[in-house]
Structures are given as C-alpha cells and as structure tokens.
A protein has these predicted regions:
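Macromolecular interaction modules
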Residues: 1-115
Length: 115
C-alpha cells in the first residue's frame, strides 16, 4: 500500500480555509481519483510537543492507494485541477509531499499489567 502525504507548513500569517478544503477540495479530489483512492485522512494540527506551542503543520493529508502505479495513473491527469484550486483554500502554495510505502504494525491482542 502507498500513502501520499501532503504537509501544509504552519507559517506565521499563512491562511488555510479548512471548511472549504473539507467541503469542496477533498470531494473534488475524491471524485477525480475515483476507485484508485482507497482511503485517507485529513489531520488538523493542534500543537507541537510543548503545551501551547504552534503545530509544525496546519494540515496534513494522507491518501492511500494500492500501488505507486495506481497513484500515478489516477493523480497525474488531474494535477492542474488540484493546483488551480489551491488559492481557494490556502496561500501555502508549496506544501511538502512525500510518498511512502505503508508497513502494518502487529499489535498485541491483549495487554497485561505487571503491577
């Protein structure tokens, strides 16, 4: 599985309209990517490690695809549409994008306390 992550840095004075992003941009992306998009999340930054500190990223988006080829075939034909819509929700026009291979963690079925 491939995860495409888009990170919008939290710069002083930058704008990000999360409402527009969730109600307009993401549905447009979902429609254009179709069945190739198998899942995803939109994470709104709350803080950094220190209490009361600004988050490093105002928004992080994670889109899941079966393969790199599935992502490229679905995404590349629509890049212009996605980029054209960016000024409608943000002035952060150069987000950081990373493509990762997802490795699943094996979690324990139960936990026990040694107290």
């Amino acid at each position: 599985m491939i995860k495409v992550s888009i990170f919008y840095a939290n710069r002083e004075g930058s704008k990000f309209d999360l409402s527009y992003y969730l109600k307009s941009h993401i549905p447009m992306v979902q429609k254009k990517l179709g069945a190739s998009l198998i899942g995803g999340t939109v994470d709104q930054g709350l803080s950094s490690v220190e209490p009361g500190s600004r988050p490093k990223f105002v928004v992080m988006v994670h889109l899941l695809f079966d393969s790199l080829e599935a992502f490229q075939n679905a995404f590349v034909p629509h890049v212009e549409s996605f980029m054209t819509d960016m000024p409608n929700y943000t002035d952060i026009l150069q987000p950081v994008i990373q493509i990762s291979e997802v490795k699943r963690l094996k979690l324990p079925l139960s936990t026990t306390s040694n107290t």
